């Protein structure tokens, strides 16, 4: 599969350099200045012509930076930029999701995209975002789709076990497998009454079975077990799959 457009390639190719950026540690090591990964995102958005607002805030003694790519839609997509292991590429968790969210914003400019901070250390960014949504900072928001581990799998994906308008929409469009997932940025959103779900593409198993089955076969979730390790490397994701996921799954959901 070839990348459809040169414009898409410019965004997708940035994943290699993004994976090479090293933070000092988790978001608890942040300072008042954006982390190296956050600064990379800001610079990338400037380079490709997307306006990126830095929402700096503190929670206790800790510093966080949510990155806001504002749109006119009532729909929102989020992905977290913080990490656990500073020695890892953090390719699938969650560098690919950040790049996919930016590509989606480029293709569908009206969508609201928020790149959150602090997911790995207690969901500080999404907790702040949930309060901002409730306070009307973005106008009425119908639902929030959370991108997690979106580096490989393309149009084969699963969603979390949340209920609501967003979940019904995804089921009507694709009827994917549904699985209860560990806590993510969806947790504070759902706790604050905001319609949300998490989406995670996964490649197909080449042999054997799993507990996630779609029309194409059984999904392979082995990538879940290398999150936060130095095995979560750039070579284990696919920019072709990333583009397929954005153009054939995310675009229909958000439009």
Residue ranges and their predicted role:
Residues 73-88:
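Glycine/charged-rich beta-loop-alpha catalytic/anionic-binding loops adjacent to active sites
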Residues 10-14, 33-36, 40, 128, ...:
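Extracytoplasmic/secreted proteins, especially bacterial periplasmic and envelope-associated proteins
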Residues 1, 40, 50-67, 75, ...:
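Catalytic phosphate/metal-binding cores of nucleic-acid and nucleotide-processing enzymes, i.e., regions
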Residues 16-72:
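A non-catalytic alpha/beta surface segment that caps or lines the substrate-entry region
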Residues 106, 208-255:
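His/Asp/Glu-rich mid-to-C-terminal helical/loop segments that flank catalytic regions of hydrolases
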Residues 1-35, 82, 222-232:
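N-terminal capping segment at the start of a domain
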Residues 85-188:
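Acidic/histidine-rich catalytic neighborhood of metal-dependent amide-processing enzymes
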Residues 5, 196-219:
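Short, solvent-exposed beta-strand-terminating loops
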